[in-house]
């Protein structure tokens, strides 16, 4: 026990950095509740109006989810078609307010629900998606749209510097956007087989290998964790084989150097 406690704060920070490559004790996120809820819609009345429209659409989708799960009486015979109409309504809101990141994040989430997290790989079965018998061209367009929405949401909300503040609402949306993109990358990596070519020809991911999807998923999980999602933070290392291997090697070396007390 005494040997393990001889590690300095710097030693622990270095070891934590190996276990969590995105961690940095000097650059914690600065949350400021006095900032506008969305940095790109600073007029309170406009934000309230836009966010209410979004909430109404999201509530409608949540009610459809409950209907699909059998948790509430059916109010429509075509819940999936109504779900798609909700996505179209989000699209209209985004067209009117293209810099409203939350709507983009929610549209990406709805597209994941409809088309599944393996949407980048044509022909891969995903039992969790709502739509069946998907057309390859349609799925490719949707995959590009979902990733573009998440890219844009992340760009819109990411603080301009490591020491810039972010509002709680913007931080939550940013965390969700990183985590959603990570989920898509992670499921793509899990389903990736030799010969697979991601069906997003105009995007960088079209050239990625399985390991590149794994690494990108880990980075996004880490950033999702940095902005508040503890589950994403935990997944950051477990989904990165390089970090896992490195962490295991370092832990074994430290156990030999400092004794069993460093086991954790």
Where are these regions (language model features)?
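Active-site-adjacent loop and "lid" segments of alpha/beta metabolic enzymes
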Residues: 190-211
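TPR/TPR-like (Sel1-like) alpha-helical repeat modules
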Residues: 147-154, 208-233, 237-240, 250-257
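Short helix-capping/linker turns of helical repeat alpha-solenoids
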Residues: 99-100, 157, 166, 173, ...
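N-terminal alpha-helical interaction modules that lie
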Residues: 1-147, 151-158, 162, 244-264
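Intrinsically disordered, low-complexity regions enriched in proline, serine, glycine
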Residues: 120, 194, 233-235, 245
């Amino acid at each position: 026990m005494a040997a393990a406690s001889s590690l300095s704060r710097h030693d622990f920070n270095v070891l934590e950095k190996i276990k969590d490559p995105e961690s940095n004790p000097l650059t914690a996120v600065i949350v400021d509740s006095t900032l506008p809820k969305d940095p790109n819609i600073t007029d309170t009345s406009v934000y309230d109006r836009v966010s209410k429209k979004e909430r109404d659409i999201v509530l409608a989708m949540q009610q459809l989810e409950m209907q699909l799960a059998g948790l509430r009486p059916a109010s429509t015979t075509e819940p999936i078609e109504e779900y798609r109409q909700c996505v179209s309504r989000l699209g209209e809101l985004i067209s009117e307010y293209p810099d409203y990141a939350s709507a983009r994040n929610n549209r990406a989430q709805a597209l994941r629900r409809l088309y599944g997290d393996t949407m980048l790989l044509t022909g891969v079965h995903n039992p969790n998606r709502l739509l069946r018998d998907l057309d390859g061209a349609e799925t490719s367009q949707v995959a590009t749209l979902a990733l573009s929405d998440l890219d844009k949401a992340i760009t819109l909300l990411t603080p301009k510097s490591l020491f810039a503040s972010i509002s709680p609402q913007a931080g939550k949306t940013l965390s969700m956007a990183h985590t959603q993109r990570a989920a898509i990358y992670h499921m793509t990596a899990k389903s990736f087989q030799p010969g697979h070519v991601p069906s997003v020809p105009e995007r960088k991911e079209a050239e990625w290998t399985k390991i590149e999807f794994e690494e990108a998923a880990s980075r996004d999980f880490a950033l999702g964790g940095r902005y508040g999602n503890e589950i994403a933070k935990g997944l950051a290392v477990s989904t990165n084989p390089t970090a896992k291997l490195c962490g295991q090697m370092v832990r074994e070396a430290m156990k030999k150097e400092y004794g069993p007390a460093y086991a954790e």
